[in-house]
Amino acid sequence: MTRRIVYGIGLWLTLAATAMTIASIVQPRWLAYDVEGHGKHGKSVKVSYGLHTLCDSVTGTCRDFPQEEDCRGDSWSFCSRWRTVGFLMSFAVVIELAVLIGYAVVLLGGKQKRDQGWKMISGCLMVAGATSCASMAIVAFLFDHDDRFFPPGWRLDSSWILCTVSWSISILTACGLIGAAIVLPEEGDYELIPEGRM
């Protein structure tokens, strides 16, 4: 049985996880390349990959990514995986927003909704966490295995970290709701009358 305070804490944690997921999608900082310039007139070079944007300090612009020229030849599997990450992260946000609506229904509903609502909310949080975790893992795999990230200077950047923290919070929140439902006693329920007293 879960109480309002448990759902309230879960709501705040889910809001934080959703904000981090949205920030990781919006910021073009999944993978970054930084190299300092050499010599008197050397300029530093910075490149950052977002899920839908590629920013480059040499041109000073950001462009849509991946484009057709990014996906020719051996890069096809990279582009396919990168687009999959974009889809999975968008799907995770949709699930997290559905969970926030679920919290509103459970918190504004009665005791029966609080008694049963944890099943739906924790299940959706697990799915959202697993989806974000898969996205994080695909980007880490591409970082380790794709040739474009072979030169020194590449690193996993802040959006990847936000994604990692977000799915961790989602999974831990789901586990907390499940644990509270199992461990906490019934909330304000009727006391049973012993059979011998009637």
Residue ranges of each PLM-predicted region?
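Intrinsically disordered cytoplasmic terminal tails of membrane proteins
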Residues: 1, 47, 182-198
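Individual transmembrane alpha-helices with interfacial aromatic-anchor signatures
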Residues: 30, 39, 43-51, 120-122, ...
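Signature of small four-pass
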Residues: 1-32, 81-143, 163-185
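A surface-exposed beta-alpha-beta supersecondary segment
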Residues: 24-86
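Juxtamembrane membrane-interface segments at transmembrane-helix boundaries in membrane proteins
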Residues: 1-3, 46, 67-88, 147-163
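Low-complexity, flexible helical/coil segments
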Residues: 59-60, 171-173, 197
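Short alpha-helical interface elements
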Residues: 34-41, 104, 112-113, 148, ...
